[in-house]
Amino acid sequence: MADSPVRPSMSHSYHCRIYVTLRPSVLDPAGTAVQSGLQQLGYDGVSQVRIGKYIELTLEAPDEATASQQLDTMCDQLLANTVIENYCFEITALEGAVTP
């Protein structure tokens, strides 16, 4: 079993937004159903609807590079099924959020 990440002695807080979507080659029945429903409501210009997941979390790390590496690992291990899903994320440092 892999070691748990060690909490750094001095860390910064980061607000993280993770977007998980099905790979383009994977059928999206939920997206198809939403697209059909919108078109039935008269929104004929709607096409290529894809349904995904949006995740927000706060992460403490010594620096943004470490936060990015940890977030990438979290996505690979749990937050996304990388066989059928792609993911991307945004990291924003929280102002003045340094913890001892």
From Swiss-Prot:
InterPro entries: PurS, PurS-like_sf
GO BP annotations listed: 'de novo' IMP biosynthetic process
Lineage top rank: taxon: Bacteria
Pathway(s) the chain acts in: Purine metabolism; IMP biosynthesis via de novo pathway; 5-amino-1-(5-phospho-D-ribosyl)imidazole from N(2)-formyl-N(1)-(5-phospho-D-ribosyl)glycinamide: step 1/2
Catalytic reaction annotation: N(2)-formyl-N(1)-(5-phospho-beta-D-ribosyl)glycinamide + L-glutamine + ATP + H2O = 2-formamido-N(1)-(5-O-phospho-beta-D-ribosyl)acetamidine + L-glutamate + ADP + phosphate + H(+)
Chief subcellular location: cytoplasm
Keyword Hydrolase: no
Xref: Pfam families: PurS (PF02700)
UniProt subcellular location: Cytoplasm
Complex formation: Homodimer. Part of the FGAM synthase complex composed of 1 PurL, 1 PurQ and 2 PurS subunits.
Family per similarity comment: Belongs to the PurS family.
Protein name, as recorded: Phosphoribosylformylglycinamidine synthase subunit PurS
Taxonomic classification: Bacteria, Bacillati, Cyanobacteriota, Cyanophyceae, Synechococcales
